[in-house]
């Protein structure tokens, strides 16, 4: 596992070479105004670097995220746009129900691939 950024406020990156999949976990419990500026650049750079290395599936594991604001939602939208523009796919997993409700209210759920667990995402990747 690779850590990008400060351990307490960064991203943990796990690569699954056989599936061409990158799992990105957020180390902080908050995706809000205070952390998203630094995370946005780290996340974009990580996605672009891994795409250049041949990876095509990206999983954002939100298991640790307990707080999210509009900046955090924007971070997820940026990740979705970066992967889509580079012919790759973004998946989200371990999302708290209140975050899904926020996505529903903002009407972005239909544009996101949301799964319950990493295992569910990996099964979907294998079937794609």
Residue ranges and their predicted role:
Residues 9-44:
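STAS-typified acidic loop motif
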Residues 31-112:
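Amphipathic alpha-helical interaction surfaces in cytosolic regulatory modules
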């Amino acid at each position: 596992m690779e850590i990008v950024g400060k351990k307490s406020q960064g991203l943990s990156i796990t690569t699954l070479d056989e599936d061409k999949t990158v799992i990105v976990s957020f180390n902080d419990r908050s995706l809000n105004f205070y952390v998203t500026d630094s995370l946005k650049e780290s996340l974009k750079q990580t996605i672009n670097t891994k795409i250049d290395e041949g990876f095509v599936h990206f999983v954002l594991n939100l298991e640790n995220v307990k707080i999210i604001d509009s900046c955090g939602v924007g971070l997820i939208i940026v990740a979705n746009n970066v992967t889509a523009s580079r012919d790759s796919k973004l998946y989200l997993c371990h999302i708290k129900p209140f975050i899904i409700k926020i996505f529903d209210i903002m009407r972005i759920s239909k544009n996101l691939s949301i799964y319950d667990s990493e295992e569910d995402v990996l099964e979907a990747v294998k079937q794609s």
